Amino acid sequence: MAALGGDGLRLLSVSRPERQPESAALSGPGSGLCCWVSVFSCFSLACSYVGSLYVWKSELPRDHPAVIKRRSTSVLVVSSLSPLCVLLWRELTGIQPGTSLLTLMGFRLEGIFPAALLPLLLTMILFLGPLMQLSMDCPCDLTDGLKVVLAPRSWARCLTDMRWLRNQVIAPLTEELVFRACMLPMLAPCTGLGPAVFTCPLFFGVAHFHHIIEQLRFRQSSVGSIFVSAAFQFSYTAVFGAYTAFLFIRTGHLIGPVLCHSFCNYMGFPAVCAALEHPQKWPLLAGYALGVGLFLLLLQPLTDPKLYGSLPLCMLLERTGASETLLCS
């Protein structure tokens, strides 16, 4: 080695090939294949989720307890099997996340308390106007309301109500698991985190088109109004899906999106028209404006990744040679 001298050592150091990113599939000729596998996997998950709702033939409406029980069983089975799709995607693409599958999907203990509280607080701030409206229209005062909320009998009644279980527990948990925890890790290496935030909700929004079938079957309104309603529902579910995808990436946890989803299901779409006709219209409209303003002001600080520890999706992109700074910092 001494005979090589300084020039020889420099020559060896120059000629040594640099270590390539772990997943050449994302930067080489196979990048198209990786994206096709990711998109097809997400499409398959969405079809499986929606299709599971219709494996049970029934003439009863969707809100009938028997229908809710059967459909809840179906989506719980599909969502519990959905991580297998991520495993298959990992094998087909050769991508190694560097963390366990559960961690990648947002099941981890690091930073779990702020991840459960801060996104929900942020969402409640956004709904400041509707919460004020709910409080003004409630016949009971704050003390009586808290007694009802904290009473074990109230919770027991909720836990035996199939519609409440579907809207507040089963739908938020299974939808966030399938459409966020499973789809985002597969889409992010292909599209990057920013585009994935807006691509993932498209599957979520389209998945809600199946409500058209229910409405047409029972002729709940005219065909035109059904399709207008479906288009509106697609729009706001896609926007909501982008928001929970943003929360999932910025916190690295599934619990925040699930709790926010449950809260939004309880609140429903803000009744702006009712607020415009309310006897206390101006305080309500001020509450709506203040809520939106505070939400935009606090969106970045309350989702600062430093509050939640390491971010699995950001680590995944680092290992694949991609650089993401906007959502990861």
Curated annotation (Swiss-Prot):
Reactions this protein catalyses: Hydrolyzes the peptide bond -P2-(S-farnesyl or geranylgeranyl)C-P1'-P2'-P3'-COOH where P1' and P2' are amino acids with aliphatic sidechains and P3' is any C-terminal residue
Residues with site note (Transition state stabilizer): H261, N265
Record text on activity regulation: Deubiquitination by USP17L2/USP17 negatively regulates the proteolytic activity toward Ras GTPases.
Entry keyword Lipid metabolism: no
Transmembrane segments: 36-56, 75-95, 112-132, 193-213, 226-246, 254-274, 282-302
Keyword list, A-Z: Acetylation, Endoplasmic reticulum, Hydrolase, Membrane, Protease, Transmembrane, Transmembrane helix, Ubl conjugation
Membrane topology summary: Multi-pass membrane protein
Protein name in UniProt: CAAX prenyl protease 2
The species this protein was found in: Mus musculus (Mouse)
